[in-house]
Amino acid sequence: MKRLPFLLLCLVLLTGCSTKKNTSGSRFWHSFTARFNTYHNGSEAYKEGMIAKETGNKDNYTEMLPFFMIGNTKSAQLGASNFETAITKCEKAIHLHSIKKKPVLSANKTRSPKTKAYLQRKEFNPFLKHAWLLMGRAQYQKGDFVAAASTFSYITRLYAAEPIVANEARLWMARSYTAMDWYYDAEDALGRALRDTIPSSLRQTLNDTQADLFLSQGKYEEAVPLLQKAAKAERRKLPKARLYFLLGQVHRELGHKQEAYKALRKCLKQNPPYELAFNARILQTEVLADAKTARKMVSRLQRMARSNNNKDYLDQVYYAMGNIYMAQNDTARAIGAYEKGRQKGTRSGIEKGVLLLRLAGIYWEQTDYEKAQKCYAEALGMIDKEYDGYADIARRSKILDELVPYTSAVRLQDSLLWLSTT
């Protein structure tokens, strides 16, 4: 009986804090509970997912790196279970703590413009915007871009009376559209966001979203200043090194050799993991190689080939060497370098696959179809079906598989005929 008053008090408080009522007390209670219970757990799960994605990510340095790691197909599912937990927690927070009912105000009280704007809101729990945004980000990082775009689109309508929240959602909506190659929709979302003044808290989000879009569209000139800003703003060493490597790749694509070299040097200054540092040094030799420096760059690569630290990367070393020779129109030496990479490379991944494709292309141009067929057949087992031009490569390989028995027979007959006449 002594506990009855306490239980009655708790019952009264809980009744007063129903989401069907909109009072200062109910808003405080549901904001506090959402933040420090379900949302907190979801936020921690999201952080763990991001750590798993960053530590487990494996970039393909033979291609232009995606701005965001979610762009790597093989890394897309890293941290997926953590992001799913974050989504579930956010959904629970929204379900339990959303306050849609408008507050009751005195009919005689004069309503200021601020009060009128407040009453235009569709969600009155002041903290739930964080749960909505976290849910959308978790869907994006999980790779469910359609769901993410849908969530962010809903946020722009739900928080139309709060421009900062709506614009943050538009920026993430643009990222989601970019990830699906829906560039028109991404540009439209960005355009809508830019109609309002972007606060300083969202400037970097805007910068990175635009950089990702320009890179995905192949607009490298426009992407350069945004990449520079992103790399400079990044404080963590590994992501910073990765962005400088990407900047080096972009400058190389644009023919800006000195700028590419400087960006790669900044990448190396971050003391990145060995594989990233190795690829940065490889790319440095390629961007600096010209008629005057080609021999020096080849010598540098030969020293790298002799280093025991690089024994697992010999396919890349000789691939870079072959590329330098090809740039000097020395096809014979290029073939020699590529063949060495083919023989000495111990891996069976995309790096060796790219080397084999380059070698196969040369043999194809020289009408040496037997060698081309072997290179294409071997390369197909090392590249993914998502590789650019995979369908054409597979078709050419199939043609050669059918053609080579006949060309081999013709060559044999020619050899026998030659022997019979000597």
Model-predicted segments: where are they?
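Sec-dependent N-terminal signal peptides
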Residues: 4-13
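Acidic, polar-rich low-complexity tracts and alpha-helical solenoid repeat scaffolds
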Residues: 16-422
